[in-house]
Amino acid sequence: MGDFFNVDNKFFQGLGKIIDVICLSAFWFFLCIPIVTAGAATTALYYTVNKVIRNNRSYIGREFWHAFKTNFRQSTIVWLILLLLYAIMGFDCYVMYQYAKAGVALGKIYIVFAVLMMFATMWAIYLFPYIARFENQTKMILKNAALIALGNLWKTLLLFVLLLAAAFAVYIF
């Protein structure tokens, strides 16, 4: 019974990690409100989870802010590229879907744009963790994240399905 009240026991360590994850989620959420900073916030989230939560080092606020500032420029560039791709493909998908609803045969090409958006999302799954983990040029980050996504296609598909399930759960609740 004396070990139960010890702050270093497994229960309190686990509780501390849960609180850290909640705080990190709040940091990430508030820094994603201005859409431009979402890439840097996501990179900082991955960096902090890896360094503080997994490896039990340092403090979450300090590490999150350090990673946010350090990776801000590169993450923002990658995020804006990704947003531009999503905007173009989303617009094309919407227009072609409207053509398909109107009975135009070429409108069925919206499926191609939807699949391209799916691949862009699977690529994005690896972009920000890659930036958080490695220092590289932006062009190499984009290339290597794509190679990782394609090289681990089944795991990437599983991550994509989990991401869709999480998005659906947030939408429902």
Describe each model-derived feature in a short phrase.
Residues 116:
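Conserved, surface-exposed functional patches that form binding/active-site neighborhoods
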Residues 1-113, 121-173:
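Helix-coil boundary and N-terminal low-complexity module in membrane systems
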